[in-house]
Amino acid sequence: MSHVTLKNSYQSLSDRLNLFPQGAPPTELLFRILEVLFTKEEASLVALLPIKPFNVAAAAKIWQKPEAESRKILETLASKGMLLDMELRDEQIFVLPPPMAGFFEFSMMRMGNGYDQKLLAELYYQYLNVEEDFVKNLFAGGETQLGRTFVNEKALNSDNTLTVMDYERASEVIHTASHMGIGACYCRHKMQHLDKACDAPMDICMTFNGTAQSLIKHGHARQVDVKEGMDLLDQAQQHNLVQFGENVQNSVAFICNCCGCCCEAMLAAKRFAVLNPIATTNFLPKVSEEACNGCGKCVNVCPVEAMGLVSAGDPHNSKRRKARLDESLCLGCGVCVRACPESGLMLQARKQRVITPVTTAHRSVLMAIERGGLQDLIFDNQAHWNHRAMAAILGVILKLPPVKQIMASKQMKSRYLAHLMKPRNFVHLEH
């Protein structure tokens, strides 16, 4: 197949994926990835699907195919991890996930799943780690990020334990999820095919709730209970892995257990540090000048190179070193605190709390506004939005800070939206 034919075959699917708030810049590498994951027919059909959740009847109408045939196609795509499907109010609902966090990861969460995973690993590495456009927009395209850091709860002392909200705790996500699934770490699995993987645990990628339900159903993840989930969390923390999860308060879909050498989020944090590509915790480690002996263990375990060693300024020992934190780089994960053998580090609250979006819809609207794609989120030309769906989006917008509301209004160029955002016209639209 020539490059021109390939591009023509998958351009429409690429255009569809680029409508997600985090985007998916169309490049030759993306077309090659899509060719591995989708047949030509699948690509043409998926390109027509809406971004919002849909049922079989909606897909059948869009495709102009019988419902039975449409259901079979949708279930095949779900079995490949290219769609998510779940039961919602006794109805089977399908969702087209974004490339990340989405079907890129799903394609590598199960060993030997029918894909050429070595080829995918090579393509993903080039698209994410060599080319810059996609990963930069994914992690640093605006103020609101796709993922956030969870604090290592064992690094908290008795004082700051009381200030941690439930949604800031990975343990709370595990205890309250309706479903929990475990799959292979996409990042380390990818690096394994490139002979670049570290020795951190592989079978430790955590998915939750509806996402886990679908991945478990189709064999991309194995179901685990709370006890095993907590055991795996402890195992991850023993290996100094950082808990990086979906940047929402409610119904978290995933928590990755990240190393600093393989994982996309940590690599992005180092690559685009000044752009704050990952939402931090509400904590920062403080170095005790008295207790720190300059051993450097905190430097070695920091996944984003926020810790360094500098001269301790000891007039009696010119070689003595002490740890110094670069607060602008620090995620506040607490890995360094647990690694210190001298108890020379302690987590303290940041001066300003980090705001976490409440729901996926809330985060998606913020990301879309900041990345200039709100019109794509609302006016998805394949989706027939009902009043309830539109009201939910508008309800999120009307709860945003004034600056974000102005950005939304400018993007939409909507007199109706501008009228709604006048203080006297504020209404509660979500119910």
Language model segments and positions:
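Long, low-complexity, charged/polar intrinsically disordered regions in eukaryotic proteins
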Residues: 1-31
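Flanking helices and flexible, charged tails adjoining ferredoxin-like Fe-S electron-transfer domains
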Residues: 318-322, 326-431
